[in-house]
Amino acid sequence: MITIEDFKIKHTNKVRFIGLDLGSKRIGVSICDERQSIATPFKTINKTNTNELIDELKIIIKDNNIGGIIVGNPVNMDGSLGRSAQSVNDVASNISKSIDLPVILWDERLSTVGAFNLSSLLDVNVSKRVKTIDQNAAAFILQGAIDFLNN
């Protein structure tokens, strides 16, 4: 894994990024456009094991001209790292070792809340919100990262 500052230096235009929201049961996936300006929810993967996740990511990467991976880091509100942050860090490290792309961790505080509230503003019904919350949270994470990278 690399730092966001190194990622900013190394990232190139005309490639897309994947954003990941690694949950205990589901993994939200988002992808940005090639101009790296808009993050879009892509899919939700039911969590099985890290190797199957990596295989699934390799397919997405191959099919979508992906140039980097941004993983939501569940930092506690006080800035400390809890048990879920350690788990995410372990998975992100395995992804980084298995896929030859830059991988960074991005602070995901309030991403799920933000995604849920945004879908509420868009008048999406509750059952659809629940089905898509993980990929929407991944888009929220990715959008924050690409906004930072572009400024």
Swiss-Prot record:
Q: Which GO terms describe its cellular component?
A: cytosol
Q: What does the entry give for GO biological process?
A: rRNA 5'-end processing
Keyword list (alphabetical) reads: Cytoplasm, Hydrolase, Nuclease, Ribosome biogenesis
Write one Gene Ontology MF term: nuclease activity
Q: Enumerate the subcellular locations listed in this protein's record, separating them with semicolons.
A: Cytoplasm
UniProt-recorded name of the protein = Putative pre-16S rRNA nuclease
Matching PANTHER family:
POLYNUCLEOTIDYL TRANSFERASE, RIBONUCLEASE H-LIKE SUPERFAMILY PROTEIN
**Similarity comment: family membership:** Belongs to the YqgF nuclease family.
Q: What class of enzyme is it?
A: hydrolase
**Is Lipoprotein among the key words of this record?**
no
Q: Name one Pfam family in it.
A: RuvX
Reported EC number(s) for this entry are: 3.1.-.-
| Origin superkingdom | Bacteria
Tell me yes or no: is Nuclease among this UniProt entry's keywords: yes
Quote the function comment for this protein: Could be a nuclease involved in processing of the 5'-end of pre-16S rRNA.
